[in-house]
Amino acid sequence: MSDRLRFLVLTACVSILPASAAAQGHMLHGIGPINSAMGGAGVALPNESLGALTFNPALITAAEGNQISFATEFFKDGILIDTTVGQLKGRATGDSQWNVVPAIGWMLRDPRGKLALGFGLIGLAGFGTDYPADASSVLFAPIPNGFGRIYTDYRETKIPIAVAYQVTPKLSVGMSLNLYLGEFGVAPLPYKYFDLDAAGNRYYPEAGKLSKSWAFAPQFGFHYQASPKVSVGASLTTPQNFSPYSWNSTHANPAGIDYGQPQTLEFDLDGPMIASFGLGLKPGKNTRIAIDGMFTKYKGVHGLGGPGGVNNGVVDPFGWRDVWTFKTGVQQQVTEKLVVRGGYNYSQMPLREEVVLSATGAPATFQNHFCGGFGFKMFPFLEVEASVYFVPREHAIGPFPDLQGNVIGTLDESNKLTGALIGMNFKF
């Protein structure tokens, strides 16, 4: 395979960078079985600690005493990447595995006071794939004919420390000081680092060991109970400026004079500003409805919101655009012990078709989320929760350019996602 084509194949099949686990831009669509079953909606509808600590810290004033939530999410994707270059056609599929994302949330309010506190350890996103080398494959043949084995792993955790205050019987305000931990590894790293041999073949170094990066970003929110049946809420999550991910690596060209010599690799991947707003409705004694909107500003964010496309022979990753999301969920108290929930979430696709090569990472094609779940009160102090969701396959189809930016084919990225969550809520 020519170096030009091998490079393009690599970029199309390996740039499955971090956000791939997410079902809504770079994040999961909801956190915990309650919030997830409601389609991620609830910025104006107090329910439990995980949704409050993720989307609106003002909601923790709804706690009566201590409330602790434990949750685990299981999800599995289905990546397909189809490339067409002249008469050559290829399909790449990942070694899809069930992934696990945990979450813990706590909130406390003295019923006689107005101050509430919250703390969490929340998995926001996670991704892992492993494509084996295959001598018979156009895509994954060993170097220099293909690109060999391809591996990626990304995890992001949010650690919120929240405080909220009930200003009046109707109005609560809250703030969360959020610490974010990102962990990222990719082998090889298909970015601006590479070695050339005499024939012009590119050899990319590995960044396979998980690199850790930290960010700090505050979050602000309010909740207003306009009437017994209507409430409104909103929150603002400020941008997350992670330090660049860094790896100790070596030069990869076996024929080069510096083969095996050390080099340091870096990749800058930050998080966006997010504005959420919503309406909470209680049309009946046992019925609760949440309707939310969310704006995620990816444009200009390092790593995610760059220009995209081929620039000076290097593909800029992602090139995502700003995204609007609509969420809605319904909760029905069926019996004294049983609650059922259903939800829907629609998110615009952050990928731009004109630079789809840059945005390769099929999970970003997710748009429609169908969700449902239930809760059961086992004891006065304990509720068990479960939910499921399905995101049908969506496609992003765009040009397949060469390193000079000339279109030589097409690229079709698609994915689907299936998930299930279980959890427990303790109140005491």
Predicted regions located by residue number:
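Bacterial N-terminal signal peptides that target proteins for export
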Residues: M1-V9
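Bacterial N-terminal signal peptides
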Residues: V9-P18
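Charged, amphipathic alpha-helical interaction segments
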Residues: I16-L17, A62, V230
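Sec/Tat signal peptide C-region and signal peptidase I cleavage site
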Residues: A19-A23
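Outer-membrane beta-barrel porins/channels
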Residues: Q24-G39, V43, G86, N99-F428
